[in-house]
Amino acid sequence: MQTWTDVIGSEKEQDYFKATLATVRSEREAGKVIYPPATDVFNAFKLTELDQVKVVILGQDPYHGPNQAHGLCFSVLPGVRTPPSLVNIYKEMQRDLPGFVTPSHGFLESWAKQGVLLLNTVLTVQAGQAHSHAHLGWETFTDRVIEQINASCQGVVFLLWGAHAQKKGRFIDRQRHHVLSAPHPSPLSAHRGFIGCGHFSETNRLLSQQGMSPINWHSVCE
């Protein structure tokens, strides 16, 4: 099976992706503040290798405030206030998972190390400007990532929250994989069905049904 190094390496040969990376690099060199830091842009792939992927959570673009984004969707670095969407994710977990205690942090690396790919569809953003890198080619790259998971893996649970993620998931083979959809956990839409979706217990039910070990979602509480 290919590794993420193979997949990302072959994309780096493509003209569209060369242009994406060159634009981000030139913006950094021009003194613009770009999140996450260059060393963290591909963190999701460093922490969750392709052959380890069991669950994919799709975000949009990185947080655009200081010290928040570190390459995992919805996650922030330790010591940074938990953002509103993640507050709602925790709220649903507390409702859905017996014994889940809302953590005081928003650092989700422990999920990534268990096979949860925390993937934003756009991997960089300019400070203070949401969606500023939405049309640089990142979307094409993350389409390729999803295609690779779709083709290489079996029985992955995709959690698609909000219209953007659901549109992105239209190519997923639902005979090979599981797709759970809900409104986005942002304060604007969480009450429309994200709270009550039960996706975390359902993910573990689907994994166990296939003989795969469930995700210890409680690892963030420890």
Curated annotation (Swiss-Prot):
It comes from Aeromonas hydrophila subsp. hydrophila (strain ATCC 7966 / DSM 30187 / BCRC 13018 / CCUG 14551 / JCM 1027 / KCTC 2358 / NCIMB 9240 / NCTC 8049). Belongs to the uracil-DNA glycosylase (UDG) superfamily. UNG family. Its EC number is 3.2.2.27. The active site is at D61. SMART domains: UDG (SM00986), UreE_C (SM00987). It catalyses: Hydrolyzes single-stranded DNA or mismatched double-stranded DNA and polynucleotides, releasing free uracil. It is found in: Cytoplasm. It holds the Pfam family UDG. InterPro entries: UDG_fam1, Ura-DNA_Glyclase_AS, Uracil-DNA_glycosylase-like, Uracil-DNA_glycosylase-like_sf. GO terms for cellular component: cytoplasm. One of its GO terms (biological process) is base-excision repair, AP site formation via deaminated base removal. CDD domains: UDG-F1-like. Its main location: cytoplasm. PANTHER family: URACIL-DNA GLYCOSYLASE. This is Uracil-DNA glycosylase. The keyword DNA damage applies. Keywords: Cytoplasm, DNA damage, DNA repair, Hydrolase. NCBIfam families: PRK05254.1-1, PRK05254.1-2, PRK05254.1-4, PRK05254.1-5, ung. It comes from the Bacteria. One of its GO terms (molecular function) is uracil DNA N-glycosylase activity. Excises uracil residues from the DNA which can arise as a result of misincorporation of dUMP residues by DNA polymerase or due to deamination of cytosine. The lineage of its organism: Bacteria, Pseudomonadati, Pseudomonadota, Gammaproteobacteria, Aeromonadales.
